[in-house]
Each structure stands twice: as structure tokens, then as C-alpha cells.
Amino acid sequence: MILDFNFKLIHQIFDLNCLPESAEVIFLGWPDLVVSEQLMIELYGDLAEQFRVENNPVPWARKDGELFDVHTVFQHHNCNLTIIDVIKHRGVEEFLDLNEPLLEHFYKRFDLVVDTGTLEHCFNVGTAFKNMCDMVKVGGVVVTSAPYSRPYHGYYNFVQETYTDGFGTNGFEILDLICTKSKKMRVVLAEEFFTKIMPGQGILNCIAKKVEDKKFTWPIQRKYSK
């Protein structure tokens, strides 16, 4: 699911104009775009109404926000979408189990890889992270979010070093790394924040660009590698 804070991160990529024309984009899991009408109007003006899903196929009444058509929105940005999952929710997904080694035709294929909350549900999370990195071309971007302090949400909670070490060891430059607690909260990462303040229901969000083609290696946590 893509919520306001996820879509703001994704939209940073559009604003930076770092995607080629006809960009290849992959979503890890079905991306229901459930965002506020206010945000869509802010980003798209009168076009926002064209993106709305009138007959909502999923009961998202428990979520704040409206459902917008992710295909129409990304087509507006000249993106070709691939959606992978282990369940065919809509019938258009390609089956891919991120717990397993990546299939050859997914390697270095995508300009943008979007994970808005899938990796923490993969039991073999290290392999899933590796697969995410291996999917993106050099010059491409990963946008990923995972729980920082949400017990019982998935199998795992992440820490900032998951991204600084995982991406930093494997040829990526981190463009943004933040913690969100709600749609209205944006906290820049700092040692004091993470050592002294534990945000309830905190979510880590990272944008990383692949700047070098490197064979993936398992990182060693930096505080132990010195």
C-alpha cells in the first residue's frame, strides 16, 4: 500500500527528473495508492480527479485517504509498471518469491524499485534485500520503507544501519533517509533521535541510487567492522 508519506518519497524521484523516458518501474507487492485528496490536488491539480478509482475493489474504509489508480498515475509519468507478489490479488501480478534467489530476467532491469512495506514480511529478509538491490540498473533508484518500531506488524523491524550498511556496501548512494511516525511527521535521522527517542509506530524510509555496478556482498555492521 502507498500512503501519503510513501508517495511523497516516490514523487521526489519525479521532481529530481532522474528517471529516463519510458522508465521501467517495479513494485514489490500490490501498490494500492491510498492517499489524501489534498496531496493529489497539491501534486496534480485538476488532473487528480482523473486518477481517482470510483468503484473501489478493496474495502479501504479503515484507512484515511482516497484510492487512486496507480497505473494511471505512473503512466502520466511515462513509467512502465511491473508488479510482483506471491499472490495474484488483481490477476496482473508476476509471481516472484523474494525469499528465493532472483530470477535471471529481473536482474538490472529496472530504473525504479519501490517497496512500501514488503521486505519485513519476507522471512528470508537478507535475500529479499539483495534481490531488491539486484533488480535496479546503475543510475536507477530504490524507494523503500520498513517498520522501525512496529512490533507484531511483520517478521522484522529495521534500523538505519540496515540501509546505510546494506546499500553503502553495494554501490548505492543514499539520497534520503528519514523516520516517519505519521503522515504529518518527518524526522531527519540523528544519533540522538535513535538512541534516546523511540517513536511509537515509527517507519524508516530510504531513497538510494545505484551509482556503481558491484556484486552484492553481505555487509558487516559498521560498529563491528572497525
Task: Locate the predicted segments by residue.
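Short amphipathic alpha-helical segments and helix-helix/interface helices
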Residues: 10, 14-16, 70-74, 129, ...
